[in-house]
């Protein structure tokens, strides 16, 4: 493990990282003045840094709203990281198979710094579908993907991730404590046991009415969940949910290993 020496500082680098971390918390972005205010810096201080980050394609300026947003460059860089690259290569064929079988979109998520990060997505072959955008982040306990990832960890690692989750929720500046308190109480040892027993979670979405999420883990060599594959299932008039669930169970998805 690399020991971090706290007696060194790099103010310009810290400024750039502060901007990137701030922009990661908003889907609509921030104006230059808002960034300066949030980071407690002057507009002049951040002007050059914003230009450099834009030139390097880490951020982009929406000329209509004059707000800065993150680009997908960080996601692209992370996808080139060998473990993530391997995970994507092994998962995508299974995801395509499931999408074809049940006519629904499928997305792949991992745990990242106290939150859930969507790193891959396969569209439904149908002419219409509900899908989750690659690069999206969510509260771990608001999603079936997050709960599955938490369930298939050691107790120590599960608690560590829940602590990091609290920090993520606070950084998001949520106005109510529903996510922080109620959802954590509902995520009981009984729920964990049921997910482990079933090797998946099938549950109505907490975010979208009419959607039932089917989430399954992908294991690493230690039998811990390294990722989760989720099908946001929309009930259709001409399809039977139980039949589609049975079809999914015939694939290699429930025994996937990275």
Language-model regions, residue ranges each:
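Short, solvent-exposed recognition segments
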Residues: 128-207
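Amphipathic alpha-helical regulatory segments at dimerization interfaces
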Residues: 22, 38, 49, 90-101, ...
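Short, structured helix-loop boundary elements
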Residues: 9-13, 32, 67, 71, ...
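Extended hydrophobic
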Residues: 174-255
């Amino acid at each position: 493990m690399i020991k971090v020496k706290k007696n060194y500082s790099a103010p310009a680098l810290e400024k750039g990282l502060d901007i990137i971390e701030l922009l990661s918390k908003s889907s609509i972005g921030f104006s230059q003045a808002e960034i300066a205010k949030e980071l407690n810096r002057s507009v002049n201080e951040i002007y050059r840094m914003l230009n450099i980050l834009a030139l390097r394609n880490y951020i982009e300026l929406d000329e209509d709203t004059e707000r800065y947003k993150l680009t997908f460059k960080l996601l692209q860089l992370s996808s080139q990281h060998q473990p993530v690259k391997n995970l994507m290569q092994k998962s995508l064929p299974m995801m395509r198979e499931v999408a074809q079988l049940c006519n629904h979109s499928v997305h792949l998520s991992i745990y990242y710094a106290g939150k859930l990060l969507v790193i891959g997505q396969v569209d439904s072959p149908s002419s219409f579908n509900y899908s989750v955008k690659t690069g999206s982040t969510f509260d771990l306990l608001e999603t079936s993907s997050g709960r599955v990832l938490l369930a298939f960890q050691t107790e120590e690692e599960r608690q560590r991730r829940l602590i990091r989750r609290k920090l993520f929720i606070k950084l998001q500046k949520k106005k109510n404590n529903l996510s922080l308190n109620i959802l954590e109480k509902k995520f009981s040892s009984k729920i964990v046991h049921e997910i482990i027993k079933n090797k998946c979670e099938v549950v109505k979405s907490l975010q979208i009415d009419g959607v039932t999420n089917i989430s399954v883990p992908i294991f690493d060599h230690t039998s811990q969940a390294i990722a989760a594959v989720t099908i946001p299932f929309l009930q259709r008039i001409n399809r039977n949910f139980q039949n589609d669930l049975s079809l999914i169970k015939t694939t290699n998805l429930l025994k996937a290993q990275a």
